[in-house]
Each structure stands twice: as structure tokens, then as C-alpha cells.
UniProtKB/Swiss-Prot annotation:
This is Alliumin. One of its GO terms (biological process) is defense response to fungus. Keywords: Antibiotic, Antimicrobial, Fungicide. It comes from Allium sativum (Garlic). Has antifungal activity against M.arachidicola with an IC(50) of 1.3 uM, but not against F.oxysporum. Has antibacterial activity against the Gram-negative bacterium P.fluorescens. No antibacterial activity against the Gram-positive bacteria B.subtilis, B.cereus and B.megaterium, or against the Gram-negative bacterium E.coli. Has antiproliferative activity towards L1210 leukemia cells with an IC(50) of 8.33 uM, but lacks antiproliferative activity towards HepG2 hepatoma cells. Lacks mitogenic towards murine splenocytes. It comes from the Eukaryota.
Amino acid sequence: DDFLCAGGCL
């Protein structure tokens, strides 16, 4: 998971 995108980046 990516904390900058809450796991929702493309």
C-alpha cells in the first residue's frame, strides 16, 4: 500500500 494514495494510485 502507498500512504500517499491510500493504495489507490494508477
